[in-house]
Amino acid sequence: MSEPENTAEDKDAEAAISADAVESETTADGGENPAEGESAEGPRMRARRERMERREAQRRAIALEQARREAKAAAKGKYVEQGKGAGRGKVQGLQTLLLVVLLALIAVGLGSILYFTPLMSVRQTVVTGTGVVTQEDVLGALSIPKGTRLLQIDTAAAADRVASIRRVASARVQCEYPSTLRVTIVERVPVAAWTGADGTHLIDRDGVDFANEPPPPGIPALDVVAPAPQDPTTKAALQVLTSLAPDLARQVAKIAAPSVSSITLTLDDGRTIVWGTTERTAEKAEKLGALLTQPGRTYDVSSPDLPTVK
C-alpha cells in the first residue's frame, strides 16, 4: 500500500504555520505602537521568540517525517528487489536441474542403444605378438565369439584367460570401435632348461616353467633341486645368468646352485667359474670378462677384490 499523502502530524504542522502567519500580519498591521512604553515591549518580544521556536520545531518535525517516509520507501524497494532476486535464483536452479535430468536421460538412452546395438559388435579379432603360441590358441583362450557386443566384453577377464596359456607372459585385450577386438601378447622366453623325471622343462627369467620340450640351441642347463619362481636357489642362479654379457652368456653350458652361496657356472669348453653368492654380481661379471682371457681351468670371482685363475 502507498503512504497517505498527508498524515495527521502534517495537518497539525500546516495549521500551526498558518496561525503564525495570521498572527504576524495582525501584529504588523494593527499592533500597538512601539512607542507606547517599555512595559508592552517585553511581552511582544517573548511572543515573537516563542513563535519562532515553534516554527523551528515544526520545520524539524516536518524534516524528520520526510526522512522517515524516504527511508520507508527505500526499504520497501529493497525488499522488492530482494524478492525478485530470490525468484530469479529459484528459476535458474530449476532450469539447471531440468538440464541435468535431460542430459542424464540422453546419456542413459545413448548408452542403452550402444550396449545392445549389433553395429557395435565383434566382427574381427586381431592377434599380435605370437611366435610359438598360435593364433588358434589365443582365440580359444579368449573365448569371445563374433557378434558379441563390444560394450559387454570384460577386457580384463579376457586378458586373464589369454595369460593363462603357459607360454604367455602377459596379455592385453582392447576394444577398437566400432567392431574390432585386439589381443596383444608377450611370449615367455627360455633362459635355462631343467631336466626332471618327466623330461626337460623350459624356464624363463622369472623362474616360470612354461614348456616340456627340448631346449633351443644355446640354452644352458639349470641345476637346482626344484625350480620355481619363489625358490631362492632358482632366483639366485637366474640372477647371475641374466647379469652376464650376451656373448659370455652364450658360452654357459650349465649353471648350478646347490645353495644361494655356492653358485658355479660351466662353459661350453669345460672351464669352471666359481661365483659364490649373488652379492656384487655386477663387479664379478666385469672382472670375469678380463679374467677369461688368461689361460686356466677354474676362474674364481667369489671375491671380486681377489679373483684367481687355476
From Swiss-Prot:
Signal peptide: none annotated. Keywords: Cell cycle, Cell division, Cell membrane, Membrane, Transmembrane, Transmembrane helix. It is found in: Cell membrane. Pfam families: FtsQ_DivIB_C (PF03799), POTRA_1 (PF08478). Residues 120-188 form the POTRA domain. Residues 1-57 are annotated as: Disordered. Gene3D superfamilies: membrane protein fhac. It is a single-pass type II membrane protein. One of its GO terms (biological process) is FtsZ-dependent cytokinesis. It comes from the Bacteria. The chain crosses the membrane at residues 96-116. Essential cell division protein. This is Cell division protein FtsQ.
